């Protein structure tokens, strides 16, 4: 397993380098082939916790089938997190825009945990024009169409998706669930109170290290943010940020549901961390 750095975001190039060094040889085609990463992911030995979530730091939890790990390239190392969206097409997930790069294959495994899981391969990526233009951190989100799996469909496998909502009001309670970067490893989650800092939703919650980028901020069954935005989610693993969810991400969902060609994901600019 890789050693996890002490801040949420690596640049994508660094994450890919770390993944390539750390990963065992796994199945899958080369980057850019159109078939992403592993077809199935081996099981993990994570220990889950039935305790109530702490507001102080992330703890082991039973995997949420609506939340999963994102694998880049031909490796068994997951580098980001993501979530299944409730959609008319039933094949859309949400993650951070800085987790993706055009020409690098990716696969998403919902509910990643002890039993491993089936990989859903990225087919198209839909991005806010502000991210395409200059990687505006306020638009650090991506809605992704996936295909594959072996069940009745992504929503069935995920036991339903998360409804896309608006940015959390300051003082509201949110739960963040995701995965630290590495091979294997179980789901971690933390509950905290949303605030606002420098124009971004923020959340004080320890342990949200590399790999949590793209992890959803959830209230009930609604996703109101994700780990990303300012400095790719934050330079300190005790405080995380989210891009602002507003009418622009809602329009992006409508576009993704309509289908059609996706966007070429640019490499994220280096953070100021």
Task: Please report, for each region that a protein language model flagged, where it lies by residue.
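Structural recognition of the beta-strand scaffold that forms the well-ordered cores
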Residues: 69, 92-94, 142-145, 174-176, ...
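Chymotrypsin/trypsin-fold serine protease catalytic domain
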Residues: 137-211
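Catalytic nucleophile loop of clan PA
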Residues: 207-228, 233-234
């Amino acid at each position: 397993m890789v050693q996890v750095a002490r801040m949420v975001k690596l640049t994508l190039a660094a994450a890919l380098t770390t993944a390539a060094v750390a990963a065992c040889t796994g199945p899958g085609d080369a980057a850019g082939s159109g078939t992403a990463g592993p077809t199935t992911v081996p099981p993990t030995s994570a220990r889950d916790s039935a305790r109530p979530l702490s507001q102080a730091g992330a703890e082991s939890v039973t995997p949420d089938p609506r939340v999963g790990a994102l694998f880049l390239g031909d490796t068994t190392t997951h580098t980001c997190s993501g979530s299944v969206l409730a959609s008319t097409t039933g094949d859309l997930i949400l993650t951070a825009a800085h987790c993706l790069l055009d020409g690098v294959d990716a696969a998403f495994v919902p509910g990643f945990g002890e039993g491993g899981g089936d990989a859903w391969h990225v087919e198209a990526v839909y991005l806010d024009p502000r991210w395409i233009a200059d990687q505006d951190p306020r638009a650090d989100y991506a809605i992704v169409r996936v295909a594959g799996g072996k069940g009745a469909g992504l929503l069935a496998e995920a036991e339903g998706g998360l409804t896309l909502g608006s940015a959390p009001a300051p003082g509201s309670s949110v739960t963040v669930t995701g995965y630290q970067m590495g091979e294997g490893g179980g789901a971690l989650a933390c509950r905290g109170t949303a605030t606002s800092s420098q124009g971004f939703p923020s959340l004080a919650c320890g342990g949200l290290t590399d790999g949590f980028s793209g992890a959803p901020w959830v209230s009930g069954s609604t996703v109101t943010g994700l780990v990303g935005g300012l400095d790719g989610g934050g330079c300190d693993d005790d405080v995380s940020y989210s891009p602002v969810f507003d009418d622009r991400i809602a329009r992006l969902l409508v576009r993704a549901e309509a289908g059609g060609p996706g966007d070429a994901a640019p490499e994220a600019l280096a953070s100021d961390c």
